[in-house]
Amino acid sequence: MRHFLLLLGVIAAMAIGAPAYSQYVFMDVNGDGVNTLADVLTSSSTTVHVYFDTNHSKAGATVTCTDGVHPLDMAIYDFVVHASGSGSVTYNGYTQSAVMNAAGFQQLNAFTVSGQNAGVGYIANNYANPGRYELGTISVTITGSPILTFVGTSTDPAIPSFGTGYGTHCDASVNTNEETLGIDFFDADGTRSSTPTESTTWGKIKQLYR
């Protein structure tokens, strides 16, 4: 009984106090500020909104830096996206949001297109507080039914941005003070397929183990 109670205490302590890397980056096509099955690229789509939430997981749980000391604030951001699927994406440019402009973020890595990839990066003199930010919008022209996904670490030498992540006071695990998708956090949603994953056989199986 004593060991059982001790185990419960340990689990409770972990659930309450254990910091985690669970930031969330996502795209929004229809402009409602969230990512859902409705965020599908069609020929009528002209913009894709890009968001970073530095201190919440996809599920909405509050997260903190793993060192328990430094904030998950942001002074630099980069992202790289990749187009795939049935159809094509023409990248026409990137416009940073008014919120990020007001926070003093200025272009660091110009919006660059290389084949199916595109990337951009901005930097500020001061750190934006932890939270959810609309970074900006990508202007696109769509044919068919393509999808856009985030690239964690880019291997495309033509794109100046390293990949998808942000500079912060929190000490990241590989890229110093650079929280990187696929290394330090994994919650990411691009645009959705016109055929929802849930409707396929494999998709139905995956839904059982979410």
Protein language model features and the residues they cover:
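Positively charged n-region of N-terminal signal peptides that target proteins for export
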Residues: 1-5, 210
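Bacterial N-terminal signal peptides
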Residues: 7-15
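Boundary/junction segments of secreted and surface-exposed precursor proteins
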Residues: 19-43, 183-187, 191-210
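Structured beta-strand segments within beta-sheet-rich domains
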Residues: 100-151
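Short, surface-exposed beta-strand/loop patches at domain edges
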Residues: 148-183
